């Protein structure tokens, strides 16, 4: 890589110029902007070529340049996955394309099995079939790398098995550090494949003990779970500060919080009443009161630094790793029945059609009339439970919600009502049940009030020309839409690529399906076709909600993005102290980091649920269970247990002695001799062969020995389609 010659602009300066230019920026425009001599223009040409090779820029028609945000032709990759088919996948170690998901590249190895998860390689990359492949140029010597695993003893030697179900290799242990067989340990890797060894640096206890599953995720994803001493001291101090006299007093209103029965914190509360403004006939007034976290957590404070490092709270079935110290998150900031609390109040004027006629924000003091569980609020409205606040608080909320719901139906947001799993534990942390979480009107009511407040927050800041940390959800990419079209064709469902894609486009597909058996998997495929939402100071709209401006405002106890929006509102409306905001590039970096922390939390929560599900199902190993196929690959298929969840592999080697054709577009395996078909969404009984609570992995077999194979099995992959389908059928 050539270094810029003296007099030439730096890469950063060129990127800044291209980004800020109001017209196409070619070599001539760049040279003129930086006043380059004829000799320096020669160096500029070489520099621009280097930047293109590095993936920093690309040339548009007419030789204008733009920031590419793509994969460099030569880059350092970190190995992140080795799938069941033996394919190795890596991701760029550095990725600076804001808002663009980090790509996964399939790595072509000279020696199969020579690379392991966590290794770093220098690789040459190229596009192939809509995806990326990488050719390893050399491996990079690793720094000290840690692995979480379980010790196993065999013939006097100790071996370490990783808790990561993607990392299937065992490592010989050179030093147990006093740990015993069966212990969950943190170890350091040494050496390189195939001679990697491990040295135990911390003993964590019994991996099968209640509450260990979340501990595994905390260690694996390096989630900060201990506050700095100065943070705890500061939290104790600010918790005692008075609320002040310059707050709007809302304590006489019957404001209520409606939350899950097991909620650990209470960010939000709501109130509604008919509007007596003659300019808003049959309209409503609503207040969404949100915990005033910005009053307690000031920019640059010790609490703020710890919160920013975490990005959000992480919720597990047995514990929460809070973004804020417990004295704030579970007590002083949390809105509680009968106690005075500081709030940032969003006052809405809602028309009879559910439109926002006006909005304003104030700092207030509230005293909740009640904390009510979703189930109790729903039962009270349905007449199944007598509640003293039914007529004074709940009924007006439901009536105002009818207007908000009408506006929501008119804008037609994406409506994918997919069930969530809920793990129920006893007091000792043992699993009582795993079941889909019930979805009530009470849930939808609170969602619509929160969405209305989030929209008001974004628009209020735009009106004040203040910085906004938007919640962005972009339109699905063409690549994902093509994959969805191919999938829908297998059910004879038309999907025109030439149409303008809106959320309603997908809703109509679901409506046409009706109550067909394959409806859940079609909804899952539509969900997979969507882009991942993220935080950014540049507004790209929220596709899924069908909204032009959207920001997260309603959960500052558990999301740093919401705290940023609170500070912006406090500053824009001159509501007192705590309104300082990051600016420019720092705001962009903050959006990127909290988006990454959000994804980290989601993965940790999902993996922990998988471990609990595997533990729950471990008592049913050997039994035949009803399943549904959730992903088809060239090495088998994945299935989930009805009513419980958890993805498990049905290896192709156990499907009998047939040759199987893998059709990527229809997501199915077809037996050449038997004509047996295994396709996405298919329901079938399978025997649960293995359930590993430590890794969360499940494995299935065909029932009644149907999988016994008299001859070698193999898969014949249908040609002409890119090999970019992975676990759960996702395109990367």
Language-model segment annotations:
Residues 126-127, 190, 630, 689-691:
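Short, surface-exposed secondary-structure boundary micro-motifs
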Residues 60, 82, 154, 351, ...:
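A short, compositionally biased micro-patch
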Residues 119, 183, 651-698, 703, ...:
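Intrinsically disordered, low-complexity linker and terminal regions at domain boundaries
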Residues 216-223, 230-656, 666, 696, ...:
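Electropositive polyanion-binding surfaces
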Residues 204, 572, 701-708:
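Short beta-strand-to-coil "C-cap" segments at the C-terminal boundary of structured domains/repeats
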Residues 85, 131, 155, 195, ...:
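A generic structural motif
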Residues 1-287, 294-339, 371, 378-379, ...:
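Charge-lined substrate channels and their catalytic hotspots, especially those that engage the 3′ end
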